Amino acid sequence: GFRVKECHSDGEFECIRAALADDKAYLNVTSEDEHDPVIDRYIRTVKERTRSTYNSVPFKKIPTMMVIEMVHASNYWLNSFPANDGVSATQSPRQIVTGQLCDFKMHCMLQFGEYVQVHESHDNSMKSRTTGAIALRPTGNNQGGMYFMSLKTGERINRYAWTQLPMPSEVIDQVHQLACHNPA
């Protein structure tokens, strides 16, 4: 295990000061308009990764939920590999905190924004057994599940089975339609 000794934050986290003190951890809260270089650098890195992802997808407009998931994906991947200046040269922040490793065959199968048909639970009816979706990010579970945006509903769904397909222009148009109803 590990023990948190110090936490850097802004005023929003003042409410956890007592809980941290009970665990003998120090909460360093910055003043209004004050900056913490470590926090600022991490925020800048997440923004750069998110901007890079945003500019790599074929969509001109994307729904708010996709932007939020893009930020989560950037954070997920930053925590999935050891940082050059991190506390461990061999263990990722995710592994240190949760004990979970990043498995290439499970967690690195799709990139953000790829088109897939996710496999739905089915019965003996004539209903479709797949749904069009856009890959968002791994769930991080041990089964290799992924979060997707359903092209039918625009909602985030969690699936572990899918078929990767080329991106037709109709899918790009559908994402643009979803973005018009819920703009970023």
Task: Cite the ranges covered by each PLM segment.
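Nucleic-acid-interacting cores, centered on viral/eukaryotic replication and modification enzymes
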Residues: 1-184
